[in-house]
Amino acid sequence: NKKGDRLFADWTGTSEQVKGAINNTLSFTKAATYCGVKCILPNDIPANEGFFRCVEVKAPPGTIANGVLPAACAARGLTGFRMVDCVLGALAMMLPDKVMAASDGGNTGISIGGYDTERNPFIYGDFACGTWGARPWADGLSGNSNLFANMATQSIEVCEAENPVEILAYEF
């Protein structure tokens, strides 16, 4: 919702907090909201108090958008990634020519464990990055982490050099 020079993001109606670790803190919900808004702004607008002051975020306590203790939140990124997509969807209704489509919704965690040929145990963990949504003026970008994430997939060479695994294909 926009009024004058202010934008209002209201997460009322969001599901109640859950036992699983996908609950957000209010600060994380605000950050996801700011991320979605920042995506449509010119690059020269800094993410500072002036920007934050123009975006008001409301998230009722006790929801996955604003969990209260003892709400688990270690996997909050999975919810936060989708929240960015929700913000972009809302903004697309106001500015359809400036907003990209939803992304892959979050990175997929990969865990492989076992024993190498000398019976030494190993554990390999990585996150498979998907794609950003298509933009009104171009295709989406493949192989990037979610807009709200700060991670990248390890290179195949590093994966194979440090673990007893062989990557047969690398594609989405």
PLM region descriptions:
Residues 1-172:
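Glycine/proline-enriched, intrinsically flexible loops and inter-domain linkers
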